[in-house]
Design a protein with these regions (language model features):
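Bacterial Sec-dependent N-terminal signal peptides
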Residues: 1-25, 69
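Post-signal peptide N-terminal segment of secreted/secretory-pathway proteins
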Residues: 24-27, 32-146
């Protein structure tokens, strides 16, 4: 009976290790695919595999965030008004996710300042006032100076 339990436990462990390695291999493939598209400046093709990896395993590699910023900036510049607002919000969300997943590589003040600059650049599209944007910059300055 003990041997039977041991065999079941070991087989379960082997199956779970195989599943984890398969997932890791899929992540490596997706990273390779979208990074090659980004290097070739084919951001539209890079978007789908990048988003899949970002949602599934954001801690896998910091390139998700570095290349993701390039992809979203391209999408912002080359999209219609409604989509543009979604991509702007997604870029701000991406920076926050980078801060959460890679805190040593991402100082909070930098993220807040980048977000405030993004809001300033697209103030009219986001229906924001100068006062709203000023408050964001002020918050970034206060947070970074602490």
């Amino acid at each position: 009976m003990r041997l039977y339990r041991l065999v079941i436990v070991l087989s379960f462990l082997l199956v779970s290790l195989n599943v984890n390695s398969q997932t890791n291999e899929d992540d490596i493939n997706l990273l390779s695919i979208f990074s090659e598209y980004v290097k070739a400046k084919n951001y539209d093709a890079a978007y789908e595999p990048w988003m899949e990896l970002r949602e599934r395993n954001p801690k896998f590699n910091s390139a998700i965030f570095v290349y993701g910023e390039r992809i979203l900036k391209y999408k912002i510049e080359n999209s219609l008004e409604e989509e543009k607002i979604n991509y702007i919000n997604d870029l701000a969300k991406l920076w926050n996710e980078k801060r959460i997943n890679f805190p040593r590589k991402t100082p909070l003040g930098d993220i807040l300042a980048k977000s405030a600059q993004l809001l300033y650049d697209y103030m009219s599209e986001l229906n924001m006032t100068k006062s709203d944007v000023y408050d964001k910059f002020d918050n970034a300055f206060i947070t970074d100076s602490e």
